[in-house]
Amino acid sequence: MALTVDVAGPAPWGFRISGGRDFHTPIIVTKVTERGKAEAADLRPGDIIVAINGQSAENMLHAEAQSKIRQSASPLRLQLDRSQTASPGQTNGEGSLEVLATRFQGSLRTHRDSQSSQRSACFSPVSLSPRPCSPFSTPPPTSPVALSKEDMIGCSFQSLTHSPGLAAAHHLTYPGHPTSQQAGHSSPSDSAVRVLLHSPGRPSSPRFSSLDLEEDSEVFKMLQENRQGRAAPRQSSSFRLLQEALEAEERGGTPAFVPSSLSSQASLPTSRALATPPKLHTCEKCSVNISNQAVRIQEGRYRHPGCYTCADCGLNLKMRGHFWVGNELYCEKHARQRYSMPGTLNSRA
């Protein structure tokens, strides 16, 4: 439907456009501001702009059409082509991408809700008319033995693993009611879960007395994870060696050598690591073992750095050297006092 709209000015006009020759689409009104000038002139989203102020907009670029609309004098005359039914992708303030995203999210939410409802129905306690996917199914109506409503007990997988007081099976045994095996009938859910009922007078045990599960079933995997989680933690090799050494020491034996992973002896053989430490030198002046730095005077003769002094004045000879007079060490000054001739001095500078 062709029509002409006059929008009273001045700019801004209160609407947005999209398309153009560079987009290979006609120029279309995409949004109209509420209570604006364009809305007052009955401009609607989805209108195709055919001409702007009498100039054809068929070959206009998008920027060119925007410029002509912004710089137009009042009133702005637009020739429109309005369809009878609004396009589903053109709504006020909502582009086609937004509409599609909203619909896609809604469909995802609906699909997720349906899956959760199916999952809850599959794992929910047994109702009066159980679904075929439930492993806890009652005998078919054609079976000669059928349990009454009072004899039905619902039990989900969660109650099977976390509620030891509850016991469920594909056929439940009660006093006065023969089982399906006694009646000669078998159910296709024999391979699902079979749990023997606990005695009413006996307290419930955390472990089931009899449990047959398929290895690829979810309940079997859940029980395996719980059993592995309760297992004792493994000891490392170093901790085990340390524990054995402490136990040997408590028994009065010789503790085994446990090298640290950071020590230099960790990579050495055991015989070398347990070897006796090297022999320490003995100071010839104070007759004490030298545990750190030693001054070598002659072969087999050592002194502490503090004991390497003049026998007369006590001056340290480390930076000066020593002179032998008999069997004593002297500095040069006191050694010359004991000899009139310097040539007789025995210098060890």
Swiss-Prot record:
Residues 74-147, 169-212 are annotated as: Disordered. The keyword Hydrolase does not apply. Residues 81-94, 178-190 have a biased composition (Polar residues). One of its GO terms (cellular component) is cytoskeleton. One of its GO terms (molecular function) is metal ion binding. Highly expressed in lung. Expressed at intermediate level in kidney, testis and spleen. Weakly expressed in heart and brain. Probable adapter protein located at the actin cytoskeleton that promotes cell attachment. Necessary for the migratory capacity of epithelial cells. Overexpression enhances cell adhesion to collagen and fibronectin and suppresses anchorage independent growth. May contribute to tumor cell migratory capacity. This is PDZ and LIM domain protein 2. It comes from Mus musculus (Mouse). The gene is Pdlim2.
